[in-house]
Structures are given as C-alpha cells and as structure tokens.
C-alpha cells in the first residue's frame, strides 16, 4: 500500500502485480494470500488474509486503472475485485455495520479484535473504489454505496474520539472463537494472560492508543 512510484514510472509492470494478486494469490472464495511464491505458481491458503493488504489491493487496482485508462483490463479484473471484497465483508464485517469487527490480521503481524481506524478506513476506501469502478462499467453498486455510508458514519461517530481514530476492542460479541483458541501469528496465552484477557481483552490491541 505504501509504494507509489512504480505505478507512475512503470505502470504496465505494476499492473502485473495486480494480476498476480487477484489471479494467482486469490482462491475461489476470495481469500488472498499476502505472500505469493516465486517463481509464480499456485499457493496454499492456510492462514489469515491480511485485511489492510487485501483491501489495499482493490485500491491499487483502482489507482492503476486511473493511471492507465485501460478499460478492458479493469473490466476483466472486476469480477475478481468483487470476489475479494465480498470475502472481506463476509469474513470481517458479517453484520455489515461498515466496520471490520471480526479479528483481522494486518501489517503489524497481529489481529485487531474490533474495529480500528487504519483497517476500517481502508475498508471504506475499498468500498468507494469498487463502487466507482462498477459504475464506470455499468454495474449496480448500491450495495457498496450503502456500506460506504455506514462505514464513514461508523468511523466518525464511533471511532473518532475528538482527537484521533481509536480502536474499539471487541471479542465476546463476535463470531470468532475465544481469542485463546483462535488461530493467530506466534501468539499463545499463558494462565496469567488468560486472566488479563477477562479484564483487558485480547493481546496486542491498540485500544485508545494512537
């Protein structure tokens, strides 16, 4: 999500990265790996998708389309973008509140339990980007427009604390299993940590941190 020079200097090369992400690294359910194999070949889907990375891929596809103006390219990629976003909605926003509530892996190598400003804002922009692409291709995007409005409202009314966007830590009211049982990245719960969980919530959450 951070590299912005390559798509402007070598746009055709950058678009091949989207081809790999969506055509090789994404399975039929819409799950996308965040590390593809070299040489390029099919990969296993046996760990979490990265919320910021997968949603960011939709933003990058939108950016690459705007830079290139290649309508044929984006039209062919569009069904895979929809498949990716629908996976994200189903996995992290199943109640369709407009925020990523279920535990979502991210670039910090942790799972955020409950909505955070970083990933939920990328979610909002992915909804916006896919809506714009869909409209340009003549598709009905009302579903994504509705979710986008909910997302912006959630960010402004529930995550913004007057100074910055904080995280709303959630774990008891989610579909995900107990944090001590959920698959995570090199994280286990000692007996002491289990006691802290009842008071403070899952490990490594940002909460009111900035």
Question: What are these model-derived regions, one by one?
Answer:
Residues 1-90, 101-105, 195-210:
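Substrate-binding groove/exosite segments of carbohydrate-active enzymes
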Residues 92-118, 122-210:
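Catalytic cores of carbohydrate-active enzymes
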